UniProtKB/Swiss-Prot annotation:
Transmembrane segments: none
Protein name: Asparagine-rich protein
Ranges for region Disordered: 20-71, 88-183
Cell compartments where the protein resides: Secreted
Predominant location: secreted
Biased composition (Basic residues): 152-166
Comp. bias regions, Basic and acidic residues: 22-35, 44-55, 115-124
Amino acid sequence: MSRLTLLVLLVIAAVIQKVHGQGRENEKKNEHEPGNQDGGNQNEKTERNLREPNRQTRRFNTRNDNRNRNIMQKRAMLLWQRRMNQRSNQNNFGNNRSIPPTNTFNRNRSRTKSNKSEVEKENGSNKASKGKMQSGDGGGNGSEKEGPERRKVQHRIAKRFQKRHPSNSPKPKPARKTTNQQYRRHFMNNYNNKYWNWRRNMLNRRRTSPQHYQNQQARWRYYRYGPYTWYRYKNKWRLVRYNNMYRRNIKTNQSKKSNQNNQGD
């Protein structure tokens, strides 16, 4: 009797379990639907956030920060470079020559403003505005005489009034120095020259910090564009300003031990 009751109880338990399990399956099947409030997977959101970044998402997360940093860096370097070019343009050599569209831009410009009365201007006797001579009383040089139109000839300004070097044209380069001239006191290959020996030592020294930066002229100019620091990348020194220092992409540690709050560096 006892065996029979045990068997019946077991069968009943199995049936109940099966039915209950089916109900759970149905509940699970519907858990993602909008009407279902309970039975949803509570960890779904955090799982989505902890997903291992693939190539595309990693690129997307990193891109904006790097772009911002690069733009700032380029802008500061360009400002500094433009200043350097302004300084070195007076010695026109190398790639620093600025060649304007024309040499003779300021040459024949009228140097005095016309202080004529309005009556004269109404009569058209302001000669600077007239490109051609006109017959009759129209104005220009030949306004008294009647006759065919003649081209207005503009003579060169007297040489002593001329600018030798108009501001926009490059100065002529002097001829190359002869051999005995170029080994003068300050020339680089003159080994008695303290300045160049110091610089040569600098260039040959293995630099692990940017303490002595070669370009002396540049040294004091970097500071104008905000606080900065040098860092070594691909065996070259690069410049980063402090306002960009904290904008780097966050390193995520994928191990199970890491916290959700890990902010990288």
